[in-house]
From Swiss-Prot:
Keywords: Cell inner membrane, Cell membrane, Ion channel, Ion transport, Membrane, Transmembrane, Transmembrane helix, Transport. It is found in: Cell inner membrane. Its main location: membrane. This is Large-conductance mechanosensitive channel. It is a multi-pass membrane protein. Belongs to the MscL family. One of its GO terms (cellular component) is plasma membrane. It comes from the Bacteria. It comes from Stenotrophomonas maltophilia (strain R551-3). Homopentamer.
Length: 134
């Protein structure tokens, strides 16, 4: 079997296609969550805390300065505001995934709980057995 044929069989398997669709949907969902956090959740939260733009929060370890040669030395800054935004995004995504898995588990338990109907042969054999008992 040629390498191209093997790759085609691999790529056309259901799991690979499902994974690709999941990655695309996940990327789109990530953009939605980013917009939700940055544009909807954080502005009111910042207003409640004191008109703070979380993405601009930072600790300046060393301010910008001009070196002896006249070149600007950039500031050394720890931008913890972006970290807070990213952390909130992670919590939202993790919670959404938790809810999806919870629903999937509930649906699979319902399918497992329903007993399978006996096969037609089994029903026929039971009828024969019952008629012989008479």
């Amino acid at each position: 079997m040629g390498m191209l044929t093997e790759f085609k069989e691999f790529a056309m398997r259901g799991n690979v296609i499902d994974l690709a669709v999941g990655v695309v949907i996940g990327a789109a969902f990530g953009k939605i969550v980013t917009a939700l956090v940055e544009k909807i959740i954080m502005p009111p939260l910042g207003m409640l805390i004191g008109k703070v733009d979380f993405s601009q929060l930072a600790w300046t370890l060393s301010p910008a300065s001009i070196g002896a040669d006249g070149k600007e030395i950039p500031a050394v800054v720890i931008g913890y505001g972006d970290f807070i935004n990213t952390l909130i995004q992670f919590v939202i995504v993790a919670f959404a995934i938790f809810l999806v898995i919870k629903v999937i588990n509930r649906l699979s338990r319902k399918q497992d709980a329903a007993p399978a109907a006996p096969a037609e042969e089994v029903v026929l054999l039971r009828e024969i057995r019952d008629s012989l008992k008479k």
